A protein has these predicted regions:
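Low-complexity "stalk/linker" and mucin-like segments enriched in Ser/Thr/Pro/Ala/Gly
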Residues: 422-437
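Extended oligomerization regions of viral-like shell subunits
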Residues: 46, 220-336
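Long, contiguous amphipathic alpha-helices that act as assembly "spine/axial" helices in icosahedral shell
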Residues: 135-207, 356-359
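Solvent-exposed, low-complexity, repeat-rich "mucin-like" stalks and linkers
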Residues: 385-414
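Extended, compositionally biased alpha-helical segments that mediate assembly or anchoring
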Residues: 1-74, 287-381
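Assembly/oligomerization interface modules of large self-assembling protein complexes
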Residues: 64-151
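Short, well-ordered beta-strand segments
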Residues: 411-426
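A short beta-strand micro-motif common to beta-rich folds, especially ectodomain repeats
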Residues: 444-457
């Protein structure tokens, strides 16, 4: 089950004002029996800073009072402020993160293909008891992103916070902002890496455009965007990696242009290309600085994914190729990302009188191969070669062999291939879409040829010769 936290009043942050700070402090006190017993009727008054200092003196007198206040304050900030800011104030979170996975550490993405029509025949045999199995595709997405952030607040920091209402605000923001902003930035970088990785892997349909050096090319780009947006509304298999039939309504599309491309083309012109009002277009647009990583982002990415087994660094050639990408155009459900755990914890070290605060951010960060996805680039997709491994092998009757195809491509061309086997005499000799060869136990042929044919360019193929020894 996936849930998304919501705020009743729609507020998105804590105001830095005496009235707001006094209300926050009093709310923490009212929710704690320990603090109510310690403070009695003493409460913060936004018009009287001395009331805050009185509270601070009581809280600082015993560790249990101080801890009770900090835990209460942190729970409020963590459950209300941060969750709400995280969901509502960040465009990437709001438009790509689906919610929170409450049970288990994986989720299955299931796609049921459209039913195939059959000709009606009033005089034909009854098919009432015939079994028509649905064509079902599925993919599992697992917990693959576990990060934590830490900040330390000293006893001195806590004392100074109660000298003024702005001091309380500064204490909260010092803890919250640094960790929250770090988590938010890292999520953006993880999504950006996912886009960059999958663009280079050739899983998106390529729309080749000219460089935006003049008005004519800009107009042609807008025409291309409009054409793709319109085509997405019609069921087809051309824009999905899995080859399933899908469609995407305009309001369910996400258009991710580079900042410089958006500035050059113009937001109003892009809105017209989508045939949407300006406000509606803002709902489908997602901003990105560039598809290549800046030096600062490169450093952060290296830290973020250090020792991560699922991280495949971009090669220099792949980084250079990303400079040619103007925009990505996807179904809003192409990103398959959700929270698994987004929680705060605190711990006080009695030996140093310092309080450590921790933010744990665990996520599933993935994508759906069943959703439409298009990349706009100045490059043209080209297949250079297809090589099958192993090139030769001996496989006995009734045995199996896993083959692989290495596709050398440029321009983000699809690296998918179709497999077939030639020379077989047995119907039991087959090869799966993933290249698993099964030799039938009744096979009489002594030699088979396995071919891998590029789906992007059928003139490019590779082959392997398989010897079937006689028993």
């Amino acid at each position: 089950m996936i849930t998304q936290p919501l705020m009743k009043d729609g507020s998105t942050g804590i105001k830095n004002s005496p009235t707001a700070m006094a209300a926050m402090v009093n709310d923490v006190i009212e929710k704690s029996d320990v603090l109510k017993n310690a403070l009695g009727d003493t409460r913060a008054n936004g018009e009287d800073p001395s009331s805050l200092r009185q509270i601070g003196q009581v809280l600082d007198s015993l560790p249990k009072y101080r801890n009770a206040f900090q835990v209460g304050l942190w729970n409020m900030v963590g459950m209300i402020l941060v969750n709400n800011m995280y969901w509502k104030n960040d465009e990437w979170v709001r438009k790509t993160l689906k919610g929170t996975l409450e049970v288990g550490d994986s989720i299955e993405d299931i796609w049921v293909e459209v039913a195939t029509p059959e000709q009606y025949n009033a005089n034909g045999a009854s098919t009432l008891t015939d079994f028509k199995k649905a064509d079902i595709l599925s993919r599992f997405h697992v917990l693959n992103y576990q990060k934590k952030y830490q900040r330390t607040v000293s006893r001195k920091d806590f004392r100074q916070a109660f000298f003024s209402f702005s001091g309380v605000y500064d204490l909260v923001m010092r803890i919250v902002d640094t960790m929250y902003n770090g988590a938010r930035w890292d999520y953006f970088l993880a999504c950006k890496y996912l886009l960059a990785r999958k663009i280079n892997d050739g899983v998106m349909k390529v729309a080749t455009v000219e460089d935006l050096t003049n008005t004519e090319n800009i107009q042609d780009f807008l025409i291309q965007v409009q054409s793709v947006s319109n085509d997405m509304e019609f069921p087809d298999e051309e824009m999905t990696e899995a080859g399933n039939i899908n469609s995407t309504a305009k309001t369910d599309q996400l258009f991710i242009p580079r900042n410089d491309v958006q500035a050059k083309v113009g937001v109003k012109a892009l809105a017209n290309a989508f045939n949407l009002e300006y406000a509606e277009y803002r709902g489908v647009e997602l901003k990105i600085n560039k598809f290549q990583f800046t030096p600062t982002e490169e450093k952060r990415l290296a830290i973020l994914f250090a020792n991560d087994p699922g991280y495949v660094p971009l090669t220099e050639e792949e980084k250079t190729a990303l400079n040619s990408v103007f925009a990505v155009h996807i179904d809003k459900d192409w990103f398959f990302c959700m929270n698994y755990l987004f929680e705060f914890y605190e711990f006080e070290d009695p030996s140093t009188l310092k309080e450590n605060f921790f933010l744990h951010d665990w996520k599933v960060i993935s994508y759906s191969p069943f959703r439409n996805a298009v990349v706009y680039t100045t490059q043209s997709p080209t297949i250079t070669s297809v090589t099958v491994t192993p090139a030769t092998a001996s496989v006995g009757k009734g045995a199996q062999l896993q083959l692989s195809a290495e596709v050398v491509a440029t321009g983000f061309a699809s690296k998918k291939v179709s497999w077939n086997v030639k020379g077989a005499t047995s119907d039991a000799t087959t090869i799966t879409p993933n290249g698993l060869l099964v030799v039938g136990s009744d096979e009489t042929a002594t030699s088979l040829t396995v071919e891998a044919i590029s789906l992007a360019d059928s003139s490019k193929n590779g082959s392997a010769t398989i010897t079937v020894p006689s028993l």
